[in-house]
Amino acid sequence: MTLKRKIKALLIDLEGVVYQEGKKIPGSISFIQYLEKINFPYLFLTNTTTMPRKDIANKLLKLGLKTNINKIITPLIAAKNYLKKNHHFSIALYCNKRCYVDFQDFQINFQSPDAVIVGDLYKKFSWEKLNEIFLTSLNSKKLIAFHKNKTGTRKGSIALDLGPFVKALEYALDNDFILMGKPSKFFFQAAVDHLGFNKKEILMVGDDKEVDIRGAQNLHLQTCLVKTGKYGKQIYLKSIEPSYILPKLSSLKSILFQ
């Protein structure tokens, strides 16, 4: 297997690829430091919605990697740009309050907002909270979900993520939430445009078949599934075949550059 000269840029997932529940995956940080050293283009493409980009950058710094905040693409930033473009400045924001810093240009309004935005509330997703979001959404112009991941990893085990709660709201409202993060084409296209390369020259590296691999394939990107994070836990997705399967992120070094 060789990727030499075929790949000119990387899109890299974070959770399950670079780190797992706050602990770095062996070899990942040194691999990205090598990318920095040789000026190889890459972006982090993450569905993390529990913290703003500056906190993600600080998290990476604590793991030994100093990175430019503009290399981190999140659904929060995608949502912010979408809202501004469509002139929706009054919003009901249901997410971790740490993320409010990315929405300082907006008025938080839970009574009659232009848009309702739903992110990962983790254990705060109660019946009361879902019903509150449902009622707020009834008269909103736009319904936005940071992502619709079915599952994530909590305390070392696979667990429900944001997606099932969004689906419940969609069913009750008989209306769809606009997806901001992976696997939406909108999100991947924004990353491709940022990099400026042909789609066939970009490789998406992730641990989630449905969100990372299928999402990238829908935009005709090359894909690499790593055997860390969620790998092996999505047995119901056998039909999704990545371009490459590797043990971990750092395994790319010998294939790409040697």
Identify what each model region corresponds to.
Residues 51:
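Conserved nucleotide-binding/hydrolysis micro-motifs of P-loop NTPases
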